[in-house]
Regions:
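Active-site mouth of glycoside hydrolases
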Residues: 37-239, 249-251, 265, 269-272, ...
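Short acidic/histidine-rich active-site segments
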Residues: 276-279
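Bacterial N-terminal signal peptides
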Residues: 18-26
Length: 363
């Protein structure tokens, strides 16, 4: 073969290769552009939360008081919840309880979320057995659950509750995701894994429209990052969770928890979402090393670093109508509240539902 022919063949092969790559990229882009989603339902594209065809993140708060649990001075009236939700950035997610003991207010919360265009992350049980969720608790409030509850005990009360809740609200876009249980523990990790996988499959069976989130601690509670990853390797679990209160640990002023990176890596290897379901800093008007203003600044830094590194959402613990003590709880007069209302990611989400969609919507 002449040098001229060889050069000609190489050029043709290069052109063919380039054309193939271009075709693959264009098909991939077309697939993304035409992906199906249900309008106003939160979903995921791998490790990225999505809403109406747009990437989604938020910085928000927990408030178990919204479900009716708490001291009288902490609780919100129906009118106050209406006003509270009206102030929130559109499409923000609020995490609260919908446990067997405190699901009587869920209808109202969903109604208010629909009215004000926000979303709810609802936890279906409390592994710490708080707020009256004493099923499986060895010693009442805050005592956790016995190991046998995660093996068989959950089938008596909790499982019917799960089926009832997810069936009832399966068509409600106001639900951002279902949390299987808050902070499962007190059993070996294999038992907890089997429990999470079973409940996730049940939820998806009765409600294929919503994301399923684990509710877990970080990997330390389950023997390390590999076990944490195994807890989430079910195809029916979409979102992993970690809770961290490391700022006050040994007065370290920690911003990025040392548990975050291994949890994020585990979820990225599974091509799934990670959220920071709880983070908090002690403060208040009494004797405390951290002022409310300092707490707000530190929490802004936490929001920034977790979202920049890939978390889908971050939730501060914990909003109540009024906070009377030094602690993690904050009220509407706290700088944290203003931070949440004005945080850039939340303001961006406010316009998501008003965009012209180029992607295919499911009815």
């Amino acid at each position: 073969m002449s040098n001229k022919e060889s050069t000609y063949n190489k050029k043709n092969r290069l052109l063919a290769f380039t054309a193939s790559i271009t075709l693959i990229l264009s098909l991939s882009s077309a697939t993304i552009a035409q992906e199906s989603y249900k309008k106003d339902f939160l979903y995921r594209r791998g490790t990225q939360l999505m809403l109406n065809g747009e990437p989604y993140q938020c910085a928000s708060f927990n408030s178990f008081q919204l479900c009716g649990c708490g001291h009288d001075y902490e609780l919100f009236s129906d009118c106050q919840i209406d006003s509270l939700f009206a102030l929130l950035p559109k499409n923000i997610i609020v995490r609260t309880w919908a446990t067997p003991a405190f699901s009587h207010r869920t209808d109202f919360l969903v109604e208010m979320a629909r009215k004000h265009n926000i979303k709810l992350l609802l936890s279906l049980a409390d592994g710490r057995s708080g707020c009256g969720d004493f099923d499986g608790a060895p010693n009442g409030d805050g005592s956790g659950k016995i190991a046998d509850w995660y093996k068989e005990g959950y089938r008596k009360k909790y499982l019917p509750h799960v089926i009832e809740m997810v069936s009832k609200y399966k068509d409600a876009p106001e639900i951002a995701m279902w949390e299987i249980i808050n902070e499962p523990a007190d059993a070996d990790w294999l038992t907890i894994r089997d429990f999470l996988h079973h409940i996730a499959a049940i939820i998806k069976k009765y409600d294929p429209n919503h994301l399923v989130e684990s509710g877990t601690f970080a990997g330390w509670a389950y023997g390390g990052a590999d076990n944490y990853k195994a807890l989430h390797d079910s195809p029916n679990i979409d979102v992993g969770n970690l809770h961290e209160y490391d700022y006050d640990y040994e007065n370290s002023n920690t911003i990025e928890s040392w548990h975050f990176a291994p949890c994020l890596k585990a979820m990225q290897e599974l091509d799934k979402v990670l959220i920071v379901g709880e983070t908090g800093i002690n403060s208040g008007d009494g004797d405390c090393r951290t002022t409310r203003s300092q707490r707000c600044d530190a929490m802004r830094s936490k929001f920034d670093i977790y979202l920049q590194k890939g978390a889908g959402a971050v939730f501060v613990w914990n909003l109540a109508r009024e906070s009377r003590n030094v602690g993690l709880t904050f009220g509407l007069d706290d700088p944290l509240w203003d931070l949440i209302l004005t945080y850039p990611a939340n303001e961006r989400n406010s316009t998501t539902s008003n965009k012209n969609y180029t992607q295919k919507e499911k009815p």
